[in-house]
Amino acid sequence: NFDISILNEFSKPPILTPHTGEFKRFFGNYYDSLCKKKVLTVREICKKFNIYLILKDVDIIIGTPKEEVIVIDNPNRLLSTAGSGDILCGLITGFISQGFSEIESILNAIKIFYTIGNFYLKNNYISYRITDFIDKISYWEDL
């Protein structure tokens, strides 16, 4: 099990990017609440633990330590491909390393993530190799 008390040891709010299964392992006591009231639960957890949370499910729910919540309701089953969450984390980290704020980094990364995912969806892909997804990052605006 994940020891959530470690979240209090960071000097800046950490960014977590769990899908719902990982969420259950991280925040088991909140899982039932999440199933009933996603937005409210994300808001509560982000405030309580001083974190950014990107909950990946059919939709994406982004929560901030300041209790802001953004829902991206643009389902794309192709974005659940193994490894795609790692790409999202890498994109976020890349933006942060360039000096963008956490929320700017998250939103920029999700924009790229969804643009590439939607390219695959619109072109009737049923799957893709994660390396092909990575290759598209350098020209995502042209997709």
Language-model regions, residue ranges each:
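Glycine-rich phosphate/dinucleotide-binding loop and adjoining beta-alpha-beta core of small-molecule
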Residues: 1-73
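A structural preference for long, well-packed, hydrophobic secondary-structure segments
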Residues: 3-9, 77, 97-98, 111
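N-terminal loops that bind phosphate or other acidic moieties
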Residues: 12, 100, 138
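Short, small-residue alpha-helix embedded
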Residues: 25, 81-112
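Short, charged, surface-exposed loops that flank catalytic or proteolytic processing sites
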Residues: 32-37, 99-107, 125-126
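Short pre-catalytic strand/loop immediately N-terminal to key active-site residues, enriched for Gly-Thr
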Residues: 70-83
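Charged C-terminal helix
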Residues: 115-143
